[in-house]
Amino acid sequence: MTGGTIRERVVESAIAITVQDGWSSVTMARIAEAVGVSRQTVYNEIGSKPDLAQAVVLDELARVLAVVQSAFEAHPRDLRAGVRTAVRGVLEYGADDALVHAIVAGTHGADTDLLPLLTTSSEPLLEVAVEVVAARLAAYRPGSRDVRRVADLVVRVVLSHLMNPAASPARTASDLAWAVDRLLPT
């Protein structure tokens, strides 16, 4: 594996192993071999396996938030369309992404070590996502001071639908966009 910093290569390797064999197959020795460095170098770059898990999830979050940013940029004057496009994009991304499937599989009895980073220990992830969504919502200058609350609601609902979809991405996106439009009149 070549290209990128050692840290980036370590995270990419952990993702590849997780997708192929599950999180329980990820070891620092296996990553070191894939990256072409010593196991100690992996520990120096990342820390412990829980630190690596957080790095993997935050890397995936960055990809998801790029979808969110792009969706809002495509609709700079239409809050409802921006929310609808962002939510649909994230849900479709999650439905197609092998790492998201590997993480969410923990809800169905498979490897569960990554799942707490989306559920019971999700505060770091949620904080980052809520900040990005709140900033995007605030750009529409809604007539409400509850932008952060609404952003938190949106992030938590989308996360819930990533783990256990109740409807199609299009339907969920439309419903959530309708709700945001009511909660944040522009």
Model-inferred region functions:
Residues M1-A34, P50-Q54, D59-A62:
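Basic, helix-initiating cap at the start of DNA-binding domains
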Residues T27, L99-A105, T112, P116, ...:
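Short, hydrophobic secondary-structure boundary micro-motifs
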Residues V35-I46:
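Short hydrophobic/aromatic patch on the recognition helix
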Residues D51, A55, V68-D96, A151:
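Hydrophobic alpha-helical connector segments
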Residues R88-E92, T119, V130, P185:
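Intrinsic, short, N-terminal disordered tails of RNA polymerase sigma-factor systems
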